Amino acid sequence: MRFLCLHGYAFSVEVLQQQMEPITAHLPSDWEYEFLEAGMEPTELMLPNLKQVPKPNYSWYNFPYPEDVEEAYERLAAYVESEGPFDGIWGFSQGGSMAALLLLMHQAEHPDTPYPFKMAIFTSAFLPHSFDNGVISWDLTEKNTLEPTYLPGRIDVSHGKKLDWKKDLHTSIEYDMINAVKDELDFPVDLLLRWRPSDIPEKIPVPSVHVRGLKDHYSFVDESVYELFDPEMARKMTHRGGHNFPRYNEELVHFAELIIETVVSLH
């Protein structure tokens, strides 16, 4: 098995390799793991404690400006095309979001061709952004509050209804982020919406493993990515930790069992 591994926000290949060592030690020794480093510098606007994070560190993108997300996606897709084939993709946090985006884009653009991966593994992952759902243009009112205007894309996720974009799953994460740093941004700010499981015409038919921590401090790390996938082919577990990989031996063993069961199901 050959896996393409994608790190999270303000991470690096080296840090992801270190975090994965406890779980890969429980997997077959002849499996291969290839790591791709993201291409953008993270910002303190997204991660206030960035100065405390070991360097070098990278992000796939910061705020979901359409051009930045597209650049990250195209870079990843080009790498898969040039360096593949890979048997699986393994994404942590924002890297998991990028892995899900890659599969969703394949489903949308090449529905009648084989997926680029036989399986996918997601650790502490969250929903990716969509190029089809339009953007929210956030602006500041005279009262210094954020006012959203929805500009639909190929798909109108509002279905003609008035939605509370400050709370909607498509946009609530971004609202919280830009509201926290609104005095440091230039408005208006146009940001992509996230995919929701209800947005896709059918579940992704790729065998998958989903792992998250019960103490994850990011509320948006939930079951949503799991719900993008065919439940008949998806396996999931939780562990006692937070926004990281499982650390207790019994949890590592269970994680490894889920991965191996998924690999066996491919044959």
Curated annotation (Swiss-Prot):
Keyword Hydrolase in annotation: yes
Annotated active site: S93, D183, H243
Alphabetized InterPro entries for the sequence: AB_hydrolase_fold, FSH-like_dom, LovG
GO CC, alphabetical: cytoplasm; nucleus
Enzyme Commission number(s) from the entry: 3.1.-.-
GO molecular function: hydrolase activity
GO BP term (any one): secondary metabolic process
Keywords: Hydrolase
Biotech utility: Fusaric acid is phytotoxic to plants such as cotton and banana. It has been shown to induce programmed cell death in plants. In addition to a mild toxicity to animals, fusaric acid exhibits acanthamoebicidal, antioomycete, and antimycobacterial activities.
One Pfam family this sequence matches: FSH1
Family (UniProt): Belongs to the AB hydrolase 3 family.
PANTHER family: ESTERASE ALNB, ESTERASE OVCA2
Function per UniProt: Hydrolase; part of the gene cluster that mediates the biosynthesis of fusaric acid, a mycotoxin with low to moderate toxicity to animals and humans, but with high phytotoxic properties. L-aspartate is suggested as fusaric acid amino acid precursor that is activated and further processed to O-acetyl-L-homoserine by cluster enzymes aspartate kinase FUB3 and homoserine O-acetyltransferase FUB5, as well as enzymes of the primary metabolism.
This protein's name: Hydrolase FUB4
Organism: Fusarium oxysporum f. sp. lycopersici (strain 4287 / CBS 123668 / FGSC 9935 / NRRL 34936) (Fusarium vascular wilt of tomato)
Name of the gene this protein is made from: FUB4
